[in-house]
Design a protein with these regions (language model features):
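Hydrophobic small-molecule pocket/channel-lining residues, especially in calycin-type beta-barrels
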Residues: 22-178
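Bacterial N-terminal signal peptides that target proteins for export
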Residues: 1-7
Length: 178
């Protein structure tokens, strides 16, 4: 019996190696491209809150990094703070998705609207986990505006009871930390 499992295992291993025989050692598989994901990758770095005049403050709001072999962008919001959260941006086929791991304990998933203006990526609710969108407070949509290479704005819209929760909608103006 053990020999049968060993033989089957070796056959599967041989098939797997044969199927990848044209891969070069150390070569990372090609990652699908999407203009929105490529724009997000250019945001890698640390972003601080802007003051009323648009100048950078010392308050770190977002740390963005490229991860998973270039197939995803990880954003850590309010790093090191009690309200720290993470958003992961990645592709599902041709669609750019954002999954927001919220301090509320839910994980809304949003899909980028392909009709977004050229200087924006608008994300719209597309499901999630640990939430009932008809009842629970959750991030329902967000718009990332690219002002220039060193200035972005993110307008988030939270929903509760199946409609926008006006007191939980806000815009963050961020400046790239130099």
């Amino acid at each position: 019996m053990a020999q049968r499992f060993l033989v089957v295992g070796l056959m599967l291993l041989a098939l797997g190696v044969g199927a990848r025989s044209d891969d070069k050692p150390g070569k990372v598989p090609a990652v699908a491209t999407n203009s929105g994901l490529e724009r997000l990758k250019k945001l890698a770095g640390t972003w601080v809150a802007a003051d009323a005049t648009g100048k950078p403050t010392d308050q770190v709001v977002s740390v963005i990094k490229i991860t998973a072999g270039g197939s995803a962008v990880q954003e850590t919001l309010f790093p090191g703070q009690p309200q720290e959260m993470v958003s992961i941006y990645h592709l599902d086929g041709a669609d750019l998705l954002m999954t927001h791991y919220c301090v509320l304990g839910n994980q809304p998933r949003m899909k980028a609207d392909p009709a977004s203006p050229p200087n924006q990526i608008r994300f719209r609710f597309a499901g999630g986990s640990n939430l009932d969108p008809a009842k629970d407070m959750h991030m329902h949509e967000g718009t990332l505006t690219f002002v220039d290479d060193d200035h972005i704005e993110f307008a988030g819209v939270a929903w509760e009871g199946g409609k926008p929760a006006e007191t939980h909608c806000a815009t963050m103006k961020l400046v790239r930390k130099k």
